[in-house]
Amino acid sequence: MKLLLITFAILQSLFATLEQKTLVSDFMLTTVNSQLSTTPMTYTGNLAMHGKQFALTMFSMEAAYDGNTLYIYSDDTEELTLSTPTEEELTQTNPFLYAQTLLPVCQYAEKAVGDKTQITLTPHDRSAGIQKFVLRIATATLLPVAIEIHEDEGKLTTLRLDNARYTEEAPSFAIEKEDAFVNDLR
């Protein structure tokens, strides 16, 4: 019981820090579906997150959420799409929001791995759609280092954060492109 309270306290501290400060990091996102292919798909970019707000760039795409509007810009098509996402869509986009929604329906496990703390959330039943959610954080700083989402049917998504840091400054969580074609779906 004591371990569960410590694990829950670590997660709540992480979530509270993300509400108060902006997490800025480079990232590598890797997905692999063992049933379809053994070749992983890998993407790199950078991100900023503050509460529910986020901004990320990778290859020829930018995405941002300012708390109301989701902005997605494609360099290839020079198109800026604006939409109002549902809570479910936001949860699927932001792994920290996803972890928060999993807390009530999961059991927790925690273990020290060097200077990191690894927290594993395992759903009580299969209705969550995943097998487990693994979060690694730097113990001393509460900086997230990696997230693994083990989904049903052999799909694994890994988000590795490099050069992660907290800052008091928040970037713009909106995208404005003067010459872009705007597709407003709000």
List the predicted regions and their residue ranges.
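An acidic-aromatic
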Residues: 46-92
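N-terminal leader/targeting segments and the immediate start of mature chains
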Residues: 1-41, 48-52, 175-186
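Flexible, surface-exposed loop/linker segments and immediately adjacent secondary-structure boundaries
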Residues: 85-116
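Short, surface-exposed charged micro-motifs
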Residues: 44-46, 62, 107-109, 132-136
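A generic structural motif
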Residues: 28-34, 57, 73, 122-124, ...
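Non-transmembrane domains of secretory- and envelope-associated proteins
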Residues: 113-116, 124-131, 139-186
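Short, surface-exposed coil-to-beta transition loops
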Residues: 40-43, 58-59, 66-67, 128-133, ...
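Short, hydrophobic/aromatic-rich segments at coil-to-beta transitions
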Residues: 21-26, 49-56, 114-120, 141-146
